[in-house]
C-alpha cells in the first residue's frame, strides 16, 4: 500500500491517493471512514497532480537546486541562533516555543514579504510553537 498527499508534496493541490492491489483499494473504498464521508478529488486537481508528478520526474536539476537552497537556509538560520527541527525535506520548521512569538514573527515576516505560517497548540504540542 502506497499513500500520499497532493496538498504538501505537489505545490498546494488538494486531496491524496492510495495505490494498492484492486482488492485492497476496493476494501478501502467500502470500509475507510474518511473515504466514505468525503468527496472524490475533482478531475482538475487530479490533472494538476499528474502534471506535477510529470514535472518533478524530469526536474533533477531543480531538485538539486532546492536541496542546496534548503541546506543554505538551514545553515544560515542555525548560525543566527534559531533551532530548526531536523528532517530531510525542504520544509524547515523554525522552533520558537512560544505561540505569541510565532504569531508575531509570522506577521512581521509577512510585512517584509516573506510568507510563513505560525503553528501552535493544538496543531503542535504545547510549548512547541513554530513557523515554517
Label each PLM-derived region with a short phrase.
Residues 1-88, 101:
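Active-site C-terminal subdomain of aminotransferase-like
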Residues 36, 111-116:
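A common structural junction motif
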Residues 40, 117-122:
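Beta-strand->loop->alpha-helix junctions that form or flank phosphate-binding loops
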Amino acid at each position: 500500500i502506497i499513500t500520499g498527499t497532493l496538498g504538501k508534496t505537489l505545490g498546494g493541490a488538494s486531496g491524496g491517493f492510495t495505490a494498492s492491489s484492486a482488492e485492497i483499494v476496493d476494501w478501502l473504498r467500502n470500509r475507510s471512514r474518511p473515504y466514505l464521508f468525503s468527496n472524490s478529488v475533482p478531475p482538475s486537481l487530479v490533472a494538476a497532480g499528474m502534471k506535477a508528478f510529470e514535472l518533478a520526474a524530469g526536474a533533477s536539476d531543480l531538485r538539486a537546486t532546492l536541496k542546496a537552497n534548503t541546506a543554505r537556509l538551514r545553515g544560515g538560520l542555525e548560525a543566527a541562533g534559531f533551532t530548526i527541527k531536523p528532517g530531510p525535506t525542504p520544509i524547515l520548521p523554525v522552533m520558537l516555543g512560544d505561540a505569541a512569538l510565532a504569531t508575531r514573527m509570522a506577521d512581521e515576516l509577512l510585512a517584509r514579504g516573506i510568507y510563513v505560517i505560525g503553528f501552535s497548540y493544538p496543531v503542535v504540542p504545547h510549548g512547541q510553537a513554530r513557523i515554517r
